[in-house]
């Protein structure tokens, strides 16, 4: 993870993720999203820290056991960019993108493609996700 490389030590909990996000903002980016899928336990927590905001946005969810998680980071970043292009603000874009990725992992958890880590199911049900709610 970028946070691990920057600090040269593993990030082990949400408080360390919050601190790392604040440190990474010092490089001049407008927002930092640290994924917490590597944390121990059955809950995951992602941390979104936006420049100029004192409190981070936390996105928690239950961890889904699946061998098919290859590409989740790329899918998440692409989905965030898509929702930003649709006019959502960053926290909303991240929330919707995480929902899309979570559903893709859930829908693909029992599918076996070759050996090793397979991809999430990107095509689980795309139509409802492309409708912008007013």
Indicate where each model-derived feature is located:
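Phosphate-handling active-site elements
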Residues: 55-57, 83-97
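Short, small-residue-biased leader/transition segments that mark boundaries at the very start
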Residues: 1-6
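Conserved phosphate-donor
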Residues: 19-61
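Solvent-exposed, amphipathic alpha-helical segments
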Residues: 75, 79, 83-87, 103, ...
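Short glycine/threonine-rich catalytic loop with a Thr-x-Gly-x-Asp
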Residues: 63-80
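Charged C-terminal helix
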Residues: 92-134
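Glycine-rich beta-alpha junction loops
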Residues: 36-40, 62-65, 97-102
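Charged helix-capping and loop-helix junction motifs
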Residues: 13-18
């Amino acid at each position: 993870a970028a946070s691990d490389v920057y600090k040269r030590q593993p990030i082990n909990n949400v408080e360390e993720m919050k601190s790392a996000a604040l440190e990474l903002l010092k490089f001049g980016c407008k927002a930092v999203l640290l994924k917490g899928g590597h944390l121990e336990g059955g809950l995951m927590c992602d941390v979104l820290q936006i420049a100029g905001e004192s409190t981070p946005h936390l996105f928690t969810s239950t961890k889904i056991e699946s061998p098919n998680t290859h590409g989740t980071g790329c899918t998440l970043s692409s989905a965030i960019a898509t929702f930003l292009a649709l006019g959502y603000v960053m926290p909303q874009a991240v929330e919707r993108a995480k929902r899309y990725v979570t559903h893709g992992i859930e829908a693909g958890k029992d599918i076996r493609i070759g050996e090793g880590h397979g991809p999430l199911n990107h095509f689980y049900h795309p139509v409802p996700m492309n409708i912008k709610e007013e």
